[in-house]
Amino acid sequence: SDQSNDDEIQNFCSDNIFDLKINYFRNKNGRGNAALNTNAAMEICTGEVVKLIYMDDFFYTEDSLQKTYDALINSDKMWLVCGTNHTRDEGKTFDHPIYPRWNDRMLKARGNNTMSGTSVISYRNKNMGVRWDANTFGLLDIDFYHSMMGKYGMCVFLDEILVSQRVNNPDNIISTRSSEQIEKEFEYC
């Protein structure tokens, strides 16, 4: 789901030099709202397993998708989170390995997100009844994890780094918000 103001992403998908099956969708609704954009993308997904990955992130290994699919399909769980790491130099070096773990305090205070960012998530598409809350910004991932846990129970923890996240600052999304805005979002969630 593409909310950009230009055609760069659409052109890339059309050129598709990698022979990938890409379902391109131009989303003009709620421009700039990551939750609404992700929900729009979820609505057009057709696969048995859906792997969310955001445009700043990429697969760490060539078999990341296969490993994700196999682990989820061979479980009785609805969703899965995988390990991740960070890169600050376009994939030349990697640091900050994260192996997600559930933490009941994630929505209590800043710094308690032990699951990591949104690109670690995969889920079974059939009967998926959870969507992202458009009123969240910095906590949208944590809020989604809690919603998934409440509806479907614990996820599969795939203890392997399969996704790399491009970061400039580990808190880059939430750091653009004032302390008051962050506190209001914690209260809301």
Give the role of each language-model region.
Residues 82, 99-181, 185:
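Conserved nucleotide-sugar donor-binding catalytic segment
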Residues 28-45:
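Glycine-rich, basic loop-to-helix element that forms the pyrophosphate-binding segment
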